[in-house]
Amino acid sequence: MKQQHLFIAILAAAIACLQPAMAQKRGKAQLPRGGKNTIAKQQPSPESLLYQELLPATAKLMFIDSLVVDKATFLQHIPFNDEMGTMGTTATFVKKKIDESFTTFVNGFGNFAILAQGDSTHSTLYSSDKLQGKWATPERLAGITDEFLVPNNPFMQSDGVTLYFGAKGSKSVGGYDLFMTRYNLDEQKFMPPENMGLPYNSKANDYLLAIDEFHELGWLVTDRNQPADKVCIYVFEPKSQRLTYADMQLPKTKLESLAQITSIKDTWMNGNRNAALLRLKNLMKSKNNK
């Protein structure tokens, strides 16, 4: 009988010792397949995918010079003239106390305007004709849909057809991107805007593209690599057709450097900088003499 009691006591003790281990086993978290070092692969953002898609078509441009200025006053540093038209705040154009960050373009003849008007969450592009000395009520630009968020800084080339503007949205690499569209005379509306690609655009904000066809000069306004409330104005030589670096078979790191405008000196191989600087000097001189 004593032996039976002793056996039962030993068995009970063994079961008691096993219970914590079994409880731990039941409560133990299961490791994901692949072991404890497995990390979920992060998917690239739509902006990153768009950037990689645009990279091979980076435009071959020559950037002549650059200037860092206050974001609030960058229009004052672009030498607008009779050939290319003028730009100013929409608040000044409509003579109302509204958001002064939105701008208006007026053509060289002074009889046609494109204005951006709205607030920080929503804006729209409008056009207005000057008839008998008075500006007509602005009408929304046909063809520029709401998928282009908070559009601003419209600029139209002297052909009266090609329009550039900045906007946010799903077709943007990051923040504001620059877009180009042309007016379809037959359909009486603008064609679907296209992203200008690199190096016009970046993962930062790219606000304005203005072109003086007569002097063969262009201005790109962006806040890439700049502190808050500052922008960089790049002066470049525009091309009548888009040229790329595809035939040069550059390493990806070099192509990305050119796409990001890491050094304007690296782009001087793409044109005659001295000739372009002379055109810029003559333009500034003629503007100062007026």
Where do the PLM segments sit?
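Bacterial Sec-dependent N-terminal signal peptides
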Residues: 1-27
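Short, conserved micro-motifs composed of acidic
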Residues: 26-290
